[in-house]
Design a protein with these regions (language model features):
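A short, Trp-centered hydrophobic/proline-enriched beta-strand micro-motif
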Residues: 117-128
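Short Gly/Pro-enriched turn/cap motifs at secondary-structure boundaries
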Residues: 87, 128-131, 155-158, 174-175, ...
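A short core secondary-structure module
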Residues: 150-194
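Buried hydrophobic positions in well-ordered alpha/beta secondary-structure cores of metabolic enzymes
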Residues: 9, 20, 51, 58, ...
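Internal helix-loop-helix
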Residues: 49-108, 112-117, 157-164
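Short secondary-structure junction/hinge motifs that connect adjacent elements
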Residues: 27-49
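Glycine-rich beta->alpha junctions and the first turn(s) of the following alpha-helix
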Residues: 2-14, 80, 193-241
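A structural signal for short hydrophobic beta-strand segments in well-ordered beta-sheet cores
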Residues: 138-141
Length: 241
């Protein structure tokens, strides 16, 4: 099967490559790494103005609706320069979650914020050293006003700067049961969320954390020997997606 880009897709590809070469060179990654920063906010805003962040988002929510082929051109362009940006976690994973599974209210609230570059997202799934989305032990139990999430997540890409998290939590079943997993929306600054930056080979911004909740969901501070994790605890209202 022949794969040929449309004229508009070719223009998007060329624009994305030019931008990545000029504004997201590998030298920028080295500077950010030296500063301990995950990405440059000014460059991210420029990406939003050029429409790169809203490629998957319908026009009614501020995007350009170029689809996955279009976004693929932007991702490929940034991959060529090892660009430091939360494009994958926000423009692909975050936007897809709302476009595919979000309620109308969630789309109206979050998609415009993603397209404008105002909202950075992160997906918190893995809990062990390897990717295994069915192995979830972080629990979500019903409580007054919503749910209480308690547990740890590892290697949350772009989690350092994320304002909104998509968290996979277990609402039923056993630890390795493929069923009984629910996705929750959690504000990055929610009470009970603790983040610890991780050093990665490509200097990309990922996080871990430390537990701050006991079994009853009441906050207290305690030390923990486990590193490279992200802990969630506290009552999370309005959130199942």
């Amino acid at each position: 099967m022949a794969f040929v880009l449309s004229e508009e897709q070719q223009m998007l590809r060329d624009s994305a490559r030019s931008f990545a070469d000029e504004r997201l060179p590998i030298s920028q990654l080295r500077v950010l790494r030296a500063k301990g920063e995950g990405f440059d906010g000014t460059t991210w805003r420029e990406m939003a103005e050029l429409g790169f962040i809203g490629v998957l988002i319908p026009e009614e929510f501020g995007g350009s609706a170029f689809g996955y082929i279009g976004l693929g051109q932007v991702l490929e362009a940034q991959g060529r320069t090892i660009a430091a940006s939360p494009l994958l976690s926000t423009a692909l994973i975050g936007a897809s979650a709302f476009v595919i599974a979000g309620s109308q209210a969630q789309k109206e609230t979050y998609l415009p914020q993603i397209a404008s570059g105002d909202l950075i997202m992160a997906l918190a799934v893995d809990e062990g050293p390897h990717h295994d989305p069915s192995h979830i032990s972080l629990t979500a139990t019903k409580s007054a006003g919503g749910y209480t999430l308690s547990g740890d997540k590892r290697y949350v890409v772009d989690g350092v700067e994320a304002g909104l998290l998509i968290v996979a939590a277990r609402t039923s079943g056993g630890e390795s049961d493929a069923n009984g997993i629910t996705l929750f929306l959690v504000q990055g600054d929610a009470k009970g969320v603790s983040r610890t930056p991780l050093k990665t080979l490509d200097a990309h911004a990922a996080v871990g954390g430390a537990p701050l909740l006991d079994r009853r969901g009441l906050q207290f501070a305690r030390s923990c020997a486990r590193n490279h994790r992200w802990h969630f605890g506290g009552d999370i209202p309005h959130i199942r997606a």
